[in-house]
Design a protein with these regions (language model features):
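N-terminal phosphate-binding or glycine-rich loops at protein starts, especially the Walker A/P-loop
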Residues: 76-142
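Glycine-rich phosphate/nucleotide-binding loop
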Residues: 217-246, 326-330, 334-439
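Glycine-rich phosphate/diphosphate-binding loop of Rossmann-like nucleotide-binding domains
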Residues: 114-115, 132, 253-315, 319
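Phosphate/nucleotide-donor binding subsite
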Residues: 153-197
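Composition-driven recognition of long, low-complexity, acid-poor segments enriched in small hydrophobic
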Residues: 36-74, 78
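Low-acidity, Ser/Thr- and Arg-rich intrinsically disordered low-complexity segments
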Residues: 8-9, 15-26, 30-33, 38, ...
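Short, glycine-rich nucleotide/cofactor-binding loops
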Residues: 101-114, 251-261, 402-408
Length: 439
């Protein structure tokens, strides 16, 4: 039997239906409906079993057929949606034939290799991936022992879901980007070489972003016609299923109008292929909507984007419109984009802190928090930068995902999901067409 709704508690006393908050009333109705559906299906199944035992072979065949229909119809139409609404999940098995190889810089990051390894082990359980984990073997095994994931690591190696690839001394977070030339066998260089040799379809690193970009340019090379690669990050919008791609968010501090034009072309292809937007709306980040607003970079870039026939240019995008859902791609210089990125990373925690502070204290506050808990978790998930744990380096001849230096396991899983999505949607094929047009 489903538990009674909040309105049936004797401690609350009689209350009219109209005085109950609308959100609570909807939750009660939703819960009762789900409980009613479950009760009806359970009763029907029980009755069918009794009828089958009494009716003999013929009835048993009918019941068996009914059970098959119930499992094929009621399961996807009733129980699976209820399980998703109630926050549950039931992972389906992953066919090993569908797994794609991704090279992971295991030594990149503030706390590597521990959190990176932990995230990779979680990712191969959730995503159709195989991981080439590059790093210093002694440090990898020590991290696995410290996190008590040694058995899980060995199982992944035995199943050929993860392969440890040895590398030399790693590049530190404080090293200059030019260190990639001196430390030729560093983990990030080995990872890039695996992609270049087609032994992996994508590379992920949470290491020194300057070194990652330098290694990608030196090892993979730039696409023909692209002067500067750009880092593109996905930001949440009002529509949960429609993120906006913002680039550049940190690769190029000083830009020319031609660079922003190229960023728009790169972002247009990614939005179309991976985000499945048929005609992406391109916006230019500016201080006003009018064509005459902005500095020289903005004014000259506006002209290039407006005259580009391959783009659906939607005009200037003010800061308040980035998350509005009115644009699919927003282009800017790397300095401005990085400031915007770091600001938005703080929004989730600040917003949740304000909501918690405004909830009333005492019994009413606890009751309200209980009903809002799932909503707050969904809000946090949409705004938490760990859920968008990686950014694509667009403009190099390979799929490269850059993660936060402070990435934990959840961020690693999110970044690897992004890498898999880009690799499985044929982004590089369309980028090759772009370089033939620009060349």
């Amino acid at each position: 039997m489903p538990p009674k709704g909040p309105d049936s508690s004797p401690a609350d006393g009689p209350r009219s239906k109209n005085s109950r908050p609308r959100a609570i009333r909807r939750l009660v109705i939703w819960y009762r409906r789900n409980a009613a559906v479950t009760t009806i299906v359970d009763s029907a199944t029980s009755s069918a079993n009794v009828a089958g035992s009494m009716a003999g072979t013929v009835a048993e065949s009918v019941v068996s057929g009914a059970g098959t229909v119930a499992s094929s119809v009621l399961q996807p139409l009733v129980f699976d949606p209820l399980r998703r609404l109630q926050g549950g999940s039931e992972d389906e098995g992953i066919d090993d034939r569908d797994r794609l190889w991704v090279a992971v810089d295991g030594m990149g990051g503030d706390h590597a290799p521990g959190p990176i390894l932990e995230g990779c082990l979680q990712a191969i359980e959730r995503l159709p991936l195989r991981i080439k984990f590059i790093g210093e073997r002694d440090r990898i095994m020590a991290a696995a022992d410290a996190l008590q994931i040694g058995d899980q690591l060995q199982a992944a190696v035995d199943n050929r879901h993860l392969e440890i690839v040895a590398s030399g001394p790693s590049i530190g977070m404080d090293d200059e980007a030019t260190a990639v030339r001196r430390k030729r066998d560093a983990s990030i260089n080995v990872a890039m070489d695996l992609v270049k040799k087609k032994e992996a379809l994508a590379v992920y690193s949470a290491g020194n972003s300057g070194a990652v970009m330098a290694s990608a340019i030196f090892r993979l090379g730039r696409l023909k016609g692209i002067d500067r690669p750009a880092i593109g990050a996905l930001f949440p919008t009002k529509d949960p299923g429609q993120p906006v791609l913002v680039l550049d968010v940190g690769a190029n501090m000083d830009c020319k109008p031609a660079y922003l034009h190229q960023f728009a072309l790169l972002g247009n292809i990614y939005s179309r292929d991976v985000l499945q937007v048929s005609r992406p709306r391109i916006g230019l980040l500016n201080i006003g909507e009018e064509e005459c607003k902005g500095n020289e970079l903005s004014l000259r870039s506006f002209e290039l984007l407006r005259d580009e026939k391959r783009l659906r240019f939607a005009g200037n995008c003010e800061g308040r419109d980035v998350l509005s859902g009115e644009f699919d791609v927003v282009v800017c210089d790397g300095f401005t984009g990085n400031v915007l990125l770091k600001f938005l990373e703080s929004v989730g925690s600040v917003l949740l802190g304000v909501l918690r502070a405004e909830l009333p204290r005492g019994r009413r506050g606890k009751v309200g928090s209980a009903f809002l808990r799932s909503n707050l978790k969904r809000i946090k998930k949409r705004l938490d930068h760990a859920e968008h744990g990686g950014a694509l380096l667009l403009g190099v001849n390979g799929i490269c995902v850059i993660g936060h230096g402070s990435s934990k396991a959840l961020s690693v899983v999110s970044a690897l999901r992004l890498a898999h999505s880009a690799a499985s949607h044929g982004v590089m094929d369309d980028l090759a067409e772009l370089q033939s047009c620009c060349g």
